[in-house]
Structure formats: C-alpha cells, structure tokens
Amino acid sequence: MSDDVDAPDLAVGHLPRRLANRHIQLIAIGGTIGTGLFMGSGRTISHAGPAVLVVYGIVGFFLFFVLRAMGELLLSNLNYKSFVDFAADLLGPGAGFFVGWSYWFAWIITGTAEIVAITGYAKFWWPDLPAWLPALVTVALILAFNLFSVRNFGEIEFWFALIKLVAIVCFILAGAILLATHFVSPQGDPATIENLWNDGGFFATGFAGVVSGFQVATFAFVGVELVGTAAAETANPRRVLPRAINAVPLRISIFYIGALLAILVVVPWRQFASGQSPFVMMFSLAGLAAAASVVNFVVITSAASSVNSGLFSTGRTLFGLADEGSAPSPFRRLNRGGVPGPALLATAALLLTSIPLLYVHGSVIGAFTLLTIVSSLLFMFVWAMIIVSYLVYRRRHQQRHADSIYRMPAGVAMCWAVLAFFAFVIWTLSTERETAIALAWFPLWLAVLAVGWLIIRRRPRHTETYRRFQIEMNRPVDQETVELVGPR
C-alpha cells in the first residue's frame, strides 16, 4: 500500500518536531561558520588589513539583529514554519513567493558551488580521481541522511559543526602559544600584538580597503539564518530558539574575531595573498607537518556541511512554497519519516548539475562565478525581507509584540539601522568591477520572479491554497507538540 494511505497524517501535514537542543545549538554554530572563514579570510585580510576585525564585528552585529527579528516573529506564532511563512502571511503571497524562491535559488547555487569545491579538495589527496565521483558520492550521501528523518540531518550537521568548532579552537590555541613563546617566523617576523598596528596602522588600507572588506565579510555569514529554517522541527522552540540566537554574538567573537586576531598577531597582515588560507599558514608555523591535509579535511567537511544545509533548506522552502500555493502541490507531501521527500529529491537532482560544470572552462565558469555572487545578494535580500516583515508585524500585531517572550532589542529603530547597513553594503558592491556586474544582473532574477508570480497569481487554485494557508497560520497552536522536549 502507498505511503499516502499508510500515513495519512504525514502525506500532507505538518513537519514533526524532532530536532533537540544540541542539534539546534550546533546547527546555529554551523550556520555561523562558513567555508569562507577557512579559505576566504586571507582575501579579506589582504583587502582590509588588521581592520578586518572591526569589519567582521560590524557585520556580525547587524546580522544578530536580523536573527533577533526572525526569532520574535517565529515565536510570535508557532504555526510559522520559517521566514517564508511569515513573509507570506504578513507581506502577502507575492512576498512569500519572492522570498521563498530567492532563498531556494540561493541555496541551489551555493550547494552546487560547494560540490564543485569538494571535488577540487578531494583531488588534493587523489589527483587521478574522476571529477564526477566526489560530486555524486556527496549528493547521494547527503540525500540519504536527509531523506528518512530530520534527526539524521541534525546528527550529521552536529558532527560537521563540531569538526569546524574543534579546528577553530585549535587554531586559536596555536596562535596563543606562538604569541606566548615569542615565536619568530622563518622570515624573521616575531609574534607580537604590535603586528596589529606597526605596519601602516590598524586601518592600513584606508577607507577603500575597509569598504572592500565589507563585500567579502558580509557574504561569509551566509547560512546564519539556517536556525530559522529549522524552527518548525525544533522540540520546545520557545526555549531552544532564543538560546541559539542569543549565543550568536559570542560565537562571532570567538570564531571570527578570535581566529583572525590569532593569525594577525602571529603573521604580519601584508604576507597574506587573496587565495591563501590563514589556517594552513598557522598550523604550518605551529609545526604541524600535515597542516595542509588537516585544513583540507576541515574544508571538505565544511563544504559538505553547506551542501547538507542547502538540501535541508531548499527542501523545507519548497514544502513551504507548496503549502501556500506558490510551488507544485507534490512538494507539500511528507514521507514516512516526516520529511518532504519529493522536495528533497528534486533538489538533489538539481545539485547534480554540478557534474557538467566540472568539465567546462572559460566563459561558463565565469558565468557560474557571477551566479554565486548573485546568490549571495539573494541571501541579503532574504535578510532584508525578514526585517521588513518585522516592521509590518509591529504595526499590525501590537498585542503579539506586547505578549512576546523574545522581543527584538531596539525594535523598529534597529530595523531601519539594519536596512541602512544593507544599503551601505550594496553601495560597496558597486565599487568593484566583478561585484558591480553581479549587482547589475541581480534585477534580472527579480524580473523572472515577477513573470512567474503574474502567472501563478492568476490561477484559481493558488487563491484557494493561499486562503487555506492563512487559515493554517491562524489556527490554535498544538501546545502538546510544541512543548515536547526531544532527546538531547
């Protein structure tokens, strides 16, 4: 007998809350730490110099308030499964359509890019390995973990995040030991706190350098909103979600600022090239002969973590879009494990488009690089829509805000400050040729969505589905399910 008959409660139903506190805490860490910290931070240092510490701190500060706004919205109505739901409910079905499909596309591109990267990292150990094999194995394994239970996703992401966490802690400890022992590099450079200002000053690259640092640093935080995507499947979200979000500033201080501070006091900042990993340099200086292999392993797990997060996020996003009538109805179906199986399978198939990219060069790779920058812009678009949703929520649901157990600090005023910061980041993108080209292409995606929305909205079935969606969003919350505390 089919799953539809055997499991009528899951065929078209609600995502079960099976993620425990430890899963959410490590998912939040994994979302905060991207592959860019391990491989791209050298580029950020070469652009901004020691002021990179301030740049990452400012970006993290504003994104923390995006998460606080998202947290208050999700906890104000536990029928919201993600930010796509509250955007559709508060801003209208068009906003849900734009936010959902933008987030879906952003993760498809990001996941594809990470799979291409995994293939490159695998060739570090096995140079003769067929290019298609690591890509196929990665997608197959990640799909297998995600297809049967959300707890499988939580477990694998838990361990991926733990590996990144251990690597960063070891990195910081190595820097502290080298500093305490007055280490001198083979080039004759001593490890000293004075490296932060003794070569051109703290803001050595000037205003232009700091501005270019914002371009790189902002997109290093892609995935920080992942904890909101997992909210619908979190046991006891009223307790777990605030804990995960409130810990973000400390995590940014340790994982980004702490790690970058460790390398800057050991190695003069001008020695970094754009493509150089500070982690490889630090572990090599600390005497770890296998430094490159260790970092390669960490980067592969970090990239696999991103693919895992991408598959999870896109599957849930398609589920939410179908729930409100903005995606084909089969994507609203849950399998026996309580996960959106059809949505996950469709996403996995699209991720396999990474394989042809491994065999092309030239203009196609250039176009793909352009798309990855556009996908980063899409993440910022989603962050901005979270803030806009919060502004509408404050105007429309004053009582909900008054009753909220998790209010956003500084509320409306901070929302406008965050939007002003995003406008500043967009301006910084216009100052570099590569990012300016991506910025110019970005409206094309919005135009494609606009055409899709004009087609979708005319369908009577969409109107009826959205009406049912609104009823669903305003139904009484099942307190027994919400207050369930899963295993730790």
How would you label these PLM feature ranges?
Residues 1-42, 46-51, 64-68, 79-80, ...:
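Membrane-interface "cap" regions at the ends of multi-pass membrane proteins
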Residues 2-8, 84-88, 115-135, 167-170, ...:
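Helix-loop-helix connectors at the membrane interface of multi-pass transporters/channels
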Residues 3-15, 52-53, 127-130, 162-297:
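Helix-loop-helix junctions that connect adjacent transmembrane segments
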Residues 16, 39-134, 138, 248-257, ...:
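Extracellular loop-to-transmembrane helix junctions
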Residues 85-88, 92, 124, 197-200, ...:
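TM-loop-TM module centered on a large, flexible mid-protein loop between adjacent transmembrane helices
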Residues 119, 133-191, 245-249, 376-385, ...:
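Membrane-interface loop-to-helix entry segments
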Residues 159-160, 331-341, 380-432:
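C-terminal membrane-solvent junction of multi-pass transporters and transport-like membrane proteins
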Residues 179, 369, 374-382, 408-488:
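A generic transmembrane alpha-helix motif of multi-pass inner-membrane proteins
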